[in-house]
A protein has these predicted regions:
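GHKL-type ATPase core
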Residues: 3-27, 43-169
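ATPase catalytic-site recognition across NTP-hydrolyzing enzymes
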Residues: 31-32
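Conserved helix-loop functional segments at active or binding sites
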Residues: 35-44
Length: 169
């Protein structure tokens, strides 16, 4: 779909197991992560800890400000392929689908279509700017990680921050 964004990670996948949210409702872990606020463990401010992120708020806001948000993950432990979509800013939650993955390699793929109307953006005129922004952020990510980073299925040919800086000299 025009204006859709996907992020793919070939790591071990999200654990596909039943758990309970704060009110005791049973659901699968990916739904808890992406569809429930206050679902993490990083809320006790009196504890010393070293963590990244802001309690999952980035992923939750992405769901809330999307027309369509889909999580697809293949759990390396359970070998289950989990797919679920959240629509219209988390007002519609599709039931998850699960299937056995056999011998496929684990991964997680997040796809979403931002609610461009909510942001008062014309998708056709904004897309070139968005593409350039995402490409720039992808190059920056490649400069700071040891992972292979791709943009639109093309590998980013830098491995270090120094490689990134050389682009501007």
């Amino acid at each position: 779909d025009e204006g859709s964004i996907s992020v793919y990670n070939n790591g071990p996948g999200i654990h596909v197991e039943k758990t309970k949210n704060l009110s005791g409702t049973e659901m699968y872990t990916p739904q808890l992560i992406f569809g429930e606020f206050m679902a993490g463990s990083n809320f006790e401010d009196s504890q010393d800890r070293i963590v990244g992120g802001q309690n999952g708020i980035g992923s939750k806001l992405t769901v809330v400000f999307s027309k369509l948000f889909t999580v697809e993950t293949l759990d390396s432990q359970s070998k289950q392929l989990y797919k679920q979509s959240f629509r219209e800013g988390l007002t519609i939650i599709d039931p998850p689908t699960l299937e056995s993955s056999g011998t496929k390699k684990p991964y997680t793929k997040i796809s979403f279509i931002p609610d461009y109307v909510e942001f008062k953006l014309n998708v056709k005129t904004f897309l070139p700017t968005l593409r350039k922004l995402l490409e720039t952020r992808t190059w920056q990510a490649a400069a700071y990680t040891s992972a292979k980073v791709y943009y639109n299925e093309s590998i980013i040919p830098i491995k270090t921050f120094e490689d990134f800086c050389q682009m501007f000299t």
